[in-house]
Amino acid sequence: LKNMDKVASITLTGSSGLFENSLGDGYPNKENYDYIRKKTEYTFYDPTVASKELVDEIFNTVNDRAKAIRVIALAKSALRHNLRKELNKIDIPANIIWGGNDNITPLFVGEEFQKLIPNAKLSVIDKCGHAAMMEHPERFNALLDQFLTDLNVKNLE
């Protein structure tokens, strides 16, 4: 919002800024691998997307003090900074791609972004949780590509 003159368009997906549904009880069991696995699975409509490699990466992140502090700071910032009154200032094309079954940032948040941002387009991916680009990468990339193609065509006219 501070440098809109340097941005041609934006794409939001599962974005914070209006409503936050935390992962519940934070990371009280951060050293419990099974707990981290369950929280990771909760992110997706299809819990099998939470591969061992992904769970390992998240487990290592939350158990690395410096990384965990950054994650917590980012989450607290999202809770403190509600952007509802600022979104109407976005005067560039906005592409919103949302998981239809997002438990972290529910679909109504994406719908609200669409209402509040002028010139915004919302696309919903069914059977998809919070991380659409991971759960349905082909569909996500096709939607992003179409938005950018349409934007480029408009700019050429």
Q: What do the PLM-derived regions correspond to, one by one?
A:
Residues 1-19:
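Conserved hydrolase catalytic core segment
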Residues 120-157:
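Catalytic active-site module of serine/aspartate enzymes centered on a nucleophile-bearing elbow/loop
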Residues 4-5, 91-92, 118-119:
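Active-site acidic short loop of glycosyltransferases
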Residues 30-92:
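Conserved alpha/beta-hydrolase catalytic His-Asp/Glu region
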Residues 69-70, 76-115, 124:
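Conserved serine/cysteine hydrolase catalytic core
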Residues 14, 39, 58, 71, ...:
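Generic structural signal for small/hydrophobic residues in well-ordered secondary structure
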Residues 7, 105, 132:
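Hydrophobic/aromatic residue at the end of a short beta strand that borders the catalytic acidic motif
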Residues 39, 71, 75, 113, ...:
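Hydrophobic "lid"/C-terminal helical patch
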